[in-house]
Amino acid sequence: MLFRSLDRTFVDGRPVDVQEEIVWERPFCNLIRFARDLPASAPPQPKLLIVAPMSGHYATLLRGTVESFLPHFDVYVTDWTDARMVPVALGTFDLDDYIDYLIDICRALGADGAPVHTLGVCQPSVPLIAAVAVMERAGDPASPASMTLMGGPIDTRRSPTAVNTLAERRGPDWFARNCIVRVPFPYPGFGREVYPGFLQLSGFMAMNLDRHVNAHLEMFHHLVEGDGDSAEKHREFYDEYMAVMDLDAAYYLQTVETVFVRHALPKGEMRHRGELVDLSTIRRAALMTVEGEKDDISGVGQTQAAIDLCVNIPQERKRHYLQLGVGHYGIFNGSRFRKEIAPRIREFISDAGRVRARSAKSGEVVA
């Protein structure tokens, strides 16, 4: 079981067993469903696709995110494969492939006609909104009913952070020369060019060193004071935070250039398989953006930019929420997320589902 301890949840106040199922597979991703043992008479709950970041950490970093939504949704999460474990013969993986994967997953989940709601945590915000734009332009019936973008770099020109400034100043060529290595023997991906996860982790840790030291001190204080729950939650999060994976070099370098150097998406210059990604084609999906006041990875306003760029989504189906007092990881993990952010996302998805259901019943297209 990938997500340890997520073997039970509560639905309508009753304990329900949970099992992980792999329902879709590709070389660089498995789609995990958290199948709940609900009675046959239970009404179906909305499908929620949580797109985990491909940024050096495993999907298990989202344990708290998944746990918060399990009582209310049929939850799926992308489990990205460590690039060092993918044989070179299976090809590379770039930003175009990422978007293709998300489109294929949405089609697989929407095959039964039920609406699919999507949630992109941090880095996936760009490929997710691009995938929705591609699907809506094509009139794809499986295009999501809603998308929630959390702490994502939609437009890094707004409130640029140290991460954004470094990427723009160095440029993709510098990263290619200094950060790309080949997977060593005896890993299955021997010879594959990758951006190693330990570089990402060391960069984040150095950026927030005082915060991490203080967090560990607080954990030990909790242990001394007998606050076992808080200390244990902190320990679990750090176990996941310290576990890192390698990224395919093609994806990493294309992301640096497209998102952080050229700002191609907000400029209307981003392409997928040679075709422009036009966010004005998005009309049917509802949109919510979530940011953290103290986020030093995706600055305030970077995710909210999606609200301005999606000009043809009616204003009443667009929402933005800024959570005070939290940084990047507090957007999707911790007590503020559970008490303040998750309930707002649930309400947003519920409203979006009702709009899509009314549209389907009347035979009209939401616009």
Q: Residue locations for each model-derived region?
A:
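Conserved acidic catalytic loop of the alpha/beta-hydrolase fold
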Residues: 85-89, 99-116, 128-133
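Conserved alpha/beta-hydrolase "acid-adjacent" motif
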Residues: 296-305
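Short, surface-exposed "cap/lid" segments of acyl-processing enzymes
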Residues: 6-86
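Conserved alpha/beta-hydrolase "nucleophile elbow" surrounding the catalytic nucleophile
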Residues: 119-121, 125, 292
